[in-house]
Each structure stands twice: as C-alpha cells, then as structure tokens.
Amino acid sequence: MEHPSPDSVSSTSSSDHKKAELSDSLKQLQLLQAFQAGDIKQVDNLLHNKSKDECTHALFISIQCANVQMVKHILSVFDVDVNAYDKNKNTPLHLAAMAGRQDIVEALLLHPDINYNLVNANNKKAYQVATSPQLMDFMKGFYVTYTKETAREFKKAFKERNLESMDYLMRHNEFNDAIDLNEVDIKTGQTYLHVATKAKDAELVKWLLDNGADPYRRDKFGKLPTDYTKDENMRSLLRSYSGNRDSSSAPAVPQHMSGYLKKWTNYKSGYKLRWFTLNNGVLSYYKNQDDASSACRGSINLKLARLVHDPKQPTVFQVIGKGSVRYSVKANSPVEAKKWIAAISSAIENDEEANKPNVTADNASFGTHDLAPAAHKFTQSNASGNSGWDDNESDIDRAQLPSRENFEFNVNIAKLQVETLHKLIDSAMQTEKVKKDPSLSQVFDGISNSFNTLHKTVLEMLDLQRQAEHYYKRKLDNAKAINALWAENLKTVVEEQDQIEERYHRSEAHRRRTKRAFRRLAASLKKRPSDKDNKLHIHYDDGAMSSTSYSTDFTDDEEETNTKDEFFDVDAHDNNHANKAEPSQTANNVHEIREPSFSSEHKPQPSLKTTTDVSSPETKQNIADIRKTTLTDQTEEFTERRDNNGSIPSKQPSDEQHLGKESLPSQQSTVSNHHRKESIPSKQPTEGQHARQESLPSQQTTETKHLRKESTPSKQPTEGQHTRQESLPSQQTTETKHLRKESIPSKQPTEGQHARQESLPSQQTTETKHLRKESIPSKQPSGGQQLRQESLPSQQSSESKQSTQHQQPVEVQKSIQSDVSAPKAKEVSEKPVSHQAKPSNASQLSRNTDDTQAKEAPKEASIPDNASTASTKVSNDSHLKPDADKKSVSSELTHASKPSLDEKTMQLAKQIAVSFHGYEAPTRENLDVNDDRPKISLWGILKGMIGKDMTKMTLPVSFNEPTSLLQRVAEDMEYTELLDQASHNKDPYQRILYVAAFAASEYASTLNRVAKPFNPLLGETYEFCHPQRGFRFIVEQVSHHPPVGAAYSESANWKYYGESSVKSKFYGKSFDISPLGTWFLELRHPSGEVELYTWKKVTSSVVGIILGSPSVDNYGQMHIVNHSSGINCVLDFKPRGWRGTNAHEVKGSVQSTDDTPKWMVNGHWNDKIFGQQPNGNKILLWQNHERPPRPFNLTPFAISLNALTPQLKPWLPPTDTRLRPDQRAMENGQYDLAASEKNRLEEKQRKKRRMREQGEMPPWSPRWFSAAKHPVTGEDYWQFNNEYWKIREEAGEAHLAGKEFEWPNVDDIF
C-alpha cells in the first residue's frame, strides 16, 4: 500500500486551509449583507451550530454594522461572551461606546454577565472612550445606580444574616466592585467585620473572612476588629486568617485603597496614625478620616515617585516623591504592608506603561476586529471637529440632521466591504494557478457581488452627504441674511432713537423757557399801575422783553455743561449743598429795576424803568408780589432741572453786557432794584459789570436793598464789580440794607470787591449792617476783600463789623500718621456762622490771614501724594493752598496715635515679608511702546455676536490690552492704604466708611479702559507683593467655563479674598459685565479683634459702541455688611444718564443695626469720595491718583503689574501671567506674534480639555485653592491652601543657588 508523500500531504492541508479561509470570508460577506438588510432568519441560518467564539465574532461585527434589534437577538439567542476581547483588546462594550451607539450600550449593560470595569489596551474603561458627553454621563449614571442598588441589597442581607442572598450577590460582584467588604460605613464608622466581631457572630465572621474581608482594616477610630472582642476563639479565628493571607503568594491588587497607617513625623513624636488614600495614581494622607474630604496634609503623584522596601522590616516602607517629599510609613502587620506595597507598585507600573507609545496591531491585516480603531478614529475626528466651537453654539434651533445614524452606519458597512474585498482578491490570487479549480468561479462571483454592494453603498453615502450639505448651506444662508438684516436695522434704530431723544429734549427745554418768560411778563403787567398813579410807573421796552426771555439765549450744550459743573460737582459747593446746585443766573436774565439817582451823570438805558415812592404801602405790596413771583419761578425751574437730572443753567455775562449796565440811569426805583437782585443769583461778573455797578445811585431805599439781598446768593465778583461797589453812595437807609443782606449768602469776594467795599460810606446804620451780616454766610475773603476791610470808615457800628468774623481763616492742624505707611490726613473743619464773635478780634484775624492767602490763587483743599486714603475734612467755606498738607488738620475722626503693633501682628508682618523677595527693583510706570494697534471696525466684528456670552467670544488680538483678567483683579489693590486706615480707627462707623471707600476705589482704573484683557488659561496664576505697603496677593484661574479666578491677599492688618466670577453679555449697544462672586475682608481693628466685611461688586458696562465712542460705566447698588457688628453701608453707583448726566456719581449711607443713618457718602468713583455726618462736616475719604496719558489707557499702577525684572523671575512659577508669551508680545508691540501665540495657547488648552474628557489626563483641580463653605456666612468660596508662598520660597532659593526646581503638581500651560 502506497503512502502519500509529505509534500503532497502539506499541499493538501494548505489547500484545505485556504478553502476554509475563503469559506469564512464568504460567510462573513453574507453575514454583513444580512446585517445590512436586517434579515434575522438569514443570520440564524449562518450562525446555526456555530461555536461560542464564532458567535462572539458575529457580535463584534453586529455592534458596528447592525441595528439594535439584531444585537439584542444575538445576545439573547446565541451563546456569546460579552466580556471577550477582540484583536485590539476591546470588549463589546468598548466598541459600542466608541461607535457612540447608546442603544447598544444599554442592551449590553443590562446583560447579567457584563463586566463594565474591564479596561482595554490603553487601560481605559468603556465609559472613558465614549464619543459624546451624553453617552459618558449615561454610562456613569448606570454604574452608580447599579453599585448603589447592589450595595443596598447586600447591606440588607447582612443585617438579616441572609447568607444565601449574600453568596448570590458576591458571585455577581465578581466582575463589578459594587460590594466592598472592607468599606467603612459612614454612620457607624466601622466595616462589616467590625460589626460581626462586636456581635460575636463567628459564622458571619468566617463568611466575611472567606470572601476577602481584611482583619487588619481599621475603623474610623483607628481600631482593629480584634480590639472589639475578648473572646480567644474569635481572636484565634482572625489571626488564623491573617496567617493564611500572609502565606498567600499574590495578594489582590486593588486600584483604590484607603486606611490608617502610621506615618513618621519627627524624632520627638515618632510615628503617628494617619488616614491614607490611594486614588488615580495619587497617594494622599490626612490627619483622620473626617478630613478626607477637605483638609489634605500632603500628596505624592506616583507617576514621579518610587517605592523603597526593606525585607528586614516587613511592616515599613517608604514612598519618595520628587524633591524632598518622602513618606516613611509603618503598617500594622506584614499582610497590610504587602497589600499597600502591591497597590502602590501597581499604580507606578500603570503610569509607566501609560507613558509608553502605543503599539497598534498589525496594520497590514484586515481582520474584522481592526475595524474598531478605524471607526473610533473616524468618530473621534467628527467629535473633535467642533472642538473649537463653544458649547452655546450647539443650541441652534434646527431639525435633526437627515439620516445621521444611517450615514455612520453606511460608513461602517463600506469599511467592512472593503475589508472583505481585499480578502477575496487575496484568495483569488492564490488560486489563479489552478485553472480548472471550481473555486475560481466562486471567487470572481464574490468579487462581483462585493463590488456591486460597495458601489451601492458609496452611492447611498454620497446622496446622504449631498442632502446634509444642502441642509447646512440653506441653514447658513438664512442665518447670514437674518444676521445682516438685524445688524443693519439695529444700527438704524439706535441712530433714530438718539435723534428723537435729542429733538425731544430741545423742545422740552424751549417750552420751559417760554413758559417762564410769559409768566414773568404777565406778573409784571398785572402789577403795572395807571399812568395817573405817580407812585409806581413801570415802562416796558425792547430791552425788557429781551431780558425777560433770557433763557432762549442758552444752547443745549451750554446748559448741559453748567449742569455737569454745578449740580453734580460735590466738592465745588458750600453751605452743605454738596449735591445741590445753587440757582445761578446772570444779570441780563431778568427784568432790571433801578432806583432814581440823585446824580446827574447817569443817562437812561433801555430797560424796565420805574419812578416810585417807596414809602407808600402800595409800592411795598408790589415789591412783595414781584418778589414772590420771581421766587416761584426760580423754585419751579430748579424742580424741573432736578427732575430731569439737570441743573439751572448759569452763565457769566460778557464784557459787553457789563459795559451796557455801567451807565444805567440813576432814576431807578426801589422796586426795580429789588426785582433785579431778587431774581439774579449772580456769579462772578467781569470788568464791565464792576465798572457799571460802581456808578449806582446812592438813593436806594432800605426796602429795595433788603429784598435784593434776600434773593441774591452772590458768587465771587471780579475786579470790575469791586470797583463799582466802592463808589456806592452813603444815603442807603437801614431797612433797604437789611432786606438786601437777608437774601444774599455771599461767597468769597475777589480783589476788586475788597477794594470797592473799603470806600463804603459811613452813614450805614446799625440795623442795616446787623441784618446784612445775619443773612450772609461769607467765605474766606481774598486779598482784595482784606484791603477793603482795612480801610472801612470808623463810623461803622459794631454790628457792621460783625460781618468780617465769617471771613476769618480756618485753623489747620496736622493729623497723626499711622504706623503703617498710610498717607497724611487732611481736614478742614467747617465752622458755623457765629453772630457774637468779637469784632476787633475777628477783623484782625481776617486781615492777618488774608494777607498770606492773597498771594495764592484760591483753590480747593489740595491732597498730597498718597492722600487717597487720607481723612481730609474739607470746609465748604474755605480754600487751602497747594501745600496745605504741611499744616495741621483738625480732624473729627477718631485716630489712634502711632498704634503699636502687638506680637501677633508683628509675627504676621514677618511671615508676609518673606514673600517680598524679587520686588527690590523700582516700580515701572510706563511702557516703551505706543498704542499703535491695527485699526479694525469693532462694530463690524461684534454685530454677529449679539446676545452671546462675552467670555466665549473670540476677538482679534488688536482688541486686547496687554493685561490679563487676573491682573485686573490685582488692580483692586491700588488703594490698600484705605484698609490700613480703617484698621487703625477705633470708631466702627468710620471703619466701614473707609472700607466702603476702598470698595468704590476699585473702579477708578476702569475709566476709558474699553479694550478687552486676555482671558486667563486654566491654571494660570498671578502674584503681586508691595513691600512698602506690606501686603502680598495671589490669584489663580480655577475654572475656564465659566471663567472664575480665586484671589487671596493679606497684610498684618487685614485679609482680602474672593472670586472674580462674572456673567457677561453683549446686547448690541453695550457690553454688560455682572459680577457674581462675593468678596470677603477680615479687618483687624485696634482692639486686636477681627471683623468680617462682605460685598458684591456692581455691574460694569461699555456703552457707545455703535456710535464709535465707547466708554465705561459702573452702576448698581453695593451692600457692604459688617458681620461682626451688624453695621452696614449701601453705595448706589448711579447709571450714566442721557448725554452724560449722573456720570460716575456715587451716593450712599452708613447705617447702624437699627437702620439709623450715621454717615452719608457721596462723590464720584473716578475722582473723589466724601463722607459727611448728618448736620455735620464732610471729610475727603479717597481721591484718585493722577493719571497721565499712557498706552492703552492704562494707569501707572496697572503698568507696573506686568513688569518682569531679572530679580523677580527666579521666584515665579511657570504659570505666572508675566511669563505668558502672547501678552508679552503685545506689550512689546509685536501684534502678529501675539496673535499667533494666542492661537497656539488656545489650541493647547482645547487639546488638554479633550484629553481630560477622554480620560487621557486626570480631571482638573485647582492647585492653590479649593472650594469650601465660608464658616461665617455659609456662602461658597475658594479657600487658599497657604502652600504657594512656601513653595515659592523653595523655588527662589534653589534657582539662586543654581539648582533646578520643578514646582510640584503645576501644569505646563504656556
């Protein structure tokens, strides 16, 4: 019998193998076609009597290509392994998650044998490779629900001692860690083994030990199970299982561990019990288990660590991190030590493997399981294609994309068809040599069928793609058309609205002026007697009419200017009218009434002229009626102005007007004189007016002068007015002068006025002078007034001399400078008018002081350098010289005299002073470049962003300024002297007054700052120290969406911390930035106690964008609360009105616990802030620093923040804003480089975000801050961990010593 040769046998076996491969490929092709058609019967025929591996192979294909009904059918009918791995080591659950098929993921998770904790080749669980956040959340939610339900059922069975149910649950817990026998219960603080041991249940203890309970697991109180029993049998049982576990070769290696270990502290204390946790490759320890959620004492990233274990000491091991971090740990037993050593070693090895480059499977092969990486890559590229878009871009109102699911499905089918086609072609090439082989025809048939199917699939895909493109194109065109129409209409509407408002205001102003003119004319005509009555003759002419309708001479621009200058200039007024405007009009604004003159020099002028007998009752009645009418007009005018946020217009008469009045006739009666003075709150007249007034007739009666003075709050006259008044005749009667003085609260006269008053005649009676002085609260006279008073004739009575007492200067005394470098305080006390001062002393004091002051131009109390925090008391009736800070100030505030720092404060100051290394260089005050950014239309870019969040806008770098939002937070620290001033003040109301001034001063730097600062990167930090003021500051970007920056600053006297969290939106006409975070201030006052203040910032807005003149406004209410005493302060930042009314204005009050006002606050946040007690004097709390022109409208303090000196650089972390390349490039004027660097940093940040979402990087957590609840207010806030300054000191010393230093756990973000 002949035996076949070995060659023939091998040839036959090879041929059979090829036929088998061909048959498998054909069956796979048939299976694909059945999956695509959804033919369940065909699938059943193909998988009938197939092995478990073949059915599992079909399951892998169906997950990628079949519908969910087909997958459920395979899972329920055929014997498959749902936890099997494919060629690329992916489970079916991994493939379903990578394909983004949530329906199939749900079907797999409901399978009883599924193990969702398995990891793939990249050491990732199934939920970590999900392509969408929704699918990832779904899978996580399922895990949590399953774990909770299983754990709840097991606890219930444990309490009931149902060992059968416990066995069933533990068997199903083999794959999923839903049950942890060593878990410490939150309520009892003990494990299952502790509870069973305390209950002396030996059977239950044995069951727990058999199923893996650890007898050396400590409870919340640090005790072992053996500590809860004295039964020797129970102790022996626990020890025996300990011995068995000790002798076991390979203890289980858990991924997460926690428990008590003894940690070496120092030679004095030795080992101390600490709670350790191992989670996500990080080993951390805490003082006890209760602190595990909040107070971490230290941690080591095992990626950078190594483990040291000496076999001679089986319970001791060391974990050594990078640098000097080293944990020397001692376990309770060798078993516990081995368990921890194995877990730590496994974590270190996993990190090392994760850092190795991935070696993919054979790329040349076209096995079925190679589809998963390709499909995952395709799906991932689709998912990451929109990574540059913000989250809010996905909520466009649209219908579902046509056939989206079918599109992805056909893509997978096409890939599998190509794979099968390659196999068939390869088989055909191998069988070409056998011409007569019938399999050749089968091969070509298969190729034909495959090509036909592939062609059909490609056509379907292209058709679906065309539909999608058509859909998106139509959607985009509609959006563009709507956006263009909206932008055009919005701009038109805004412009039309502005024009309508302007026309309305002009019409309303004209109506009011006309109404007042006719009212005055009607009142004058009503009182006009008949020609036969010689007691009062009133003549009207063109001059009277022109003067009657005076208001029409004012333009809107002039009216607005006067409104702004007078009504809202809180420090430009006197007599407690800080927020009111004095009615001020020129002499030609009303009817002029003159008295008859006994001098023949004066010639008549066109005016309202009368000839009257002032002694008659009718004349007096007419005078009273006219005075009443005029006062009514003034009151109505002032009310209207106030209601419209305006003020009464005032305008100084020109020289021509003065010259016209110089030659007024002398035959003018008392009524005319009364009417002129009554309705003319005069300002400083010019030379012509003074010259005209000098020639007034002397026969003015008493009543006329009295009325004139009652209604004329005069301002400072100029030289011409003084000269005119010097030649007043002496025949004025007592009554006239009395009436005049009652109505004229005069201000400081100038040199001309003083010279005029020196030559007043001596015939003035005592009564006139006394009444005049009663009604004229005068200010400090200037040099001219002093000269006039020195030459007063001796016939003046004592009452007349009393008028000079109000002109005496105010004594100024130096305030006490605080121990901290706070600025000098200046105060000028306002002295009330006194009617009983000694005339001689008052006059002499006025002369002596005015001689000195006459050399200086009278101006407001000047503030010295650093006077922004000074408590300056400004008198409404006084002016100080520029060097007034050298004089002493009489302060009503309660100051501590040179407060001595206690021991605790000194210690705090020393701790903070350590952080001042690197800040030895002088402060930078300017930039070397100019603001020559490329000019781009702001509206052209922003018009498509209306209604969106500003923080998610991507603007060109030319719209930025070379600062960061973190540095904007640091700009709040410019006026910290206010906090030092508050700290040294003993009065609680004055303390909160200075705190309020500090809160308002934070907005001073926002003026004209319309450019957008750079958005901080996640993890970016900024530090700033001020050695002269003794504080240090640190801020970190702890969140990116929404953007949140956590800040912390401290000095020896205070701690200031909070979060910069805003909600911003663009409304088309304006940007609105609304702060959300609360700011906390812990202030140490002179008694040593600490007070807590809190407040939230007000809304900032950039307006005027469409009109091309953007400006910054801050508005809203700020509530400052002292939680220690209950005192509060409310600041109201007035919004900018139409045409600039109320611009920058701040008003508020300090209230006691029973809501009683104690102090009033007013001023402007861009200039000065004042405080004033009710019915008391006001003090200057804060004044803005000088702001010279700088590039990008930056303040000198803001310019100093980004300075990077060689002394400072070694001390900074790699995340500091000063090291940011795009911001530095823009500061240097390299705008193209800044744009490219900005784009690079943003792409790098997006890439890290995607890696964190996919599980390739650990989740983000802030490095220097942690979220917590405030212990006093209960609000959420960011708690500083106090590690930054310690590590900074280590880094600086290492760099100065020439050593390398890596900041621990700090990301590379630049």
Swiss-Prot record:
**Pfam families assigned:** Ank, Ank_2, Oxysterol_BP, PH
Q: Which InterPro entries match?
A: Ankyrin_rpt, Ankyrin_rpt-contain_sf, OSBP_sf, Oxysterol-bd, Oxysterol-bd_CS, PH-like_dom_sf, PH_domain
Start-end of Low complexity biased regions:
1-14, 785-808
Provide the residue intervals of the ANK repeats: 54-84, 88-118, 188-217
Q: Which residues carry this modification: Phosphoserine?
A: S384, S394
A GO CC annotation recorded here is:
cytosol
Stretches for region Disordered? 1-20, 526-561, 574-904, 1228-1258
A GO MF annotation of the entry reads: sterol binding
Q: Where is the composition biased (Polar residues)?
A: 607-622, 713-734, 837-847, 865-875
- Basic and acidic residues bias located where? 528-542, 591-604, 703-712, 735-744, 767-776, 824-833, 848-859, 876-889, 1235-1245
UniProt keywords, alphabetically:
ANK repeat, Lipid transport, Lipid-binding, Phosphoprotein, Repeat, Transport
Annotated PH domain ranges read: 254-349
**GO biological process entries:** endocytosis; exocytosis; intermembrane lipid transfer; maintenance of cell polarity; piecemeal microautophagy of the nucleus; sterol transport
UniProt similarity note: Belongs to the OSBP family.
Q: How does it assemble?
A: Interacts with dil1.
Q: What is this protein called?
A: Oxysterol-binding protein homolog C2F12.05c
